[in-house]
Amino acid sequence: MAAYPDSLKAQLARRDNIREMTSDDLGSVIDVEIAAYEHPWTLGIFRDCLRVGYSCWVYEDESSVVAYGIVMLSGAEAHVLNLCVHPDFQRRGIGRLLLNHLTQMSRESGADTILLEVRQSNIIAMQLYLSADFHELGVRTGYYPDHEGREDAIILAKSLITDHDPMLGI
């Protein structure tokens, strides 16, 4: 049996921290949302995501929800509606782990494309998505509320039909 490098062992172990979101998680999810965003989603939006059957996931660190991801699957397309990591846990690879999970789950569900919108000002998220082989498709003008009015969203997409995906290590 081949020995895995310590960094890979740690990454594989951390995947176990991802599980499906339940309604019991919504209080913690809202706490993460409010800590991370100036214009957070409401509790009702998260309830609706669970109710309509979107693919909703949380990442736990020592039994506390510190991140989550929500994907709408529709035929051959997966749309990441929200991917958020609590500010105290950002820049630790949790966002990448969740993105990997959402991508793999979308592929396994039959999607051949995964897309998302990101605030033009969210440089850290843009770097994550571009490093994960997402490509810019366009701009949604005035998509997000902003303290000065509205902010544009960059539309990013990634093909899931390739045999080799460096983000997933395959």
Task: State where each predicted segment sits.
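Acetyl-CoA-dependent GNAT
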Residues: 2-5, 9-90, 96-109, 142, ...
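Conserved catalytic-core motifs of GNAT/GCN5-like acyltransferases
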Residues: 2-4, 117, 130, 135-155
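Short amphipathic helical patch at the helix-1/turn junction of helix-turn-helix
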Residues: 85, 119-120
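Short phosphate-binding/catalytic loops that engage adenosine nucleotides
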Residues: 94, 111-114, 134
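Short glycine/proline-centered loop/turn elements that form peptide/ligand docking sites
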Residues: 99, 122-125, 142-147
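Alpha-helical structural signal in soluble globular domains
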Residues: 105, 128-132, 158
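Conserved GNAT acetyl-CoA-binding A-motif
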Residues: 106-117, 128
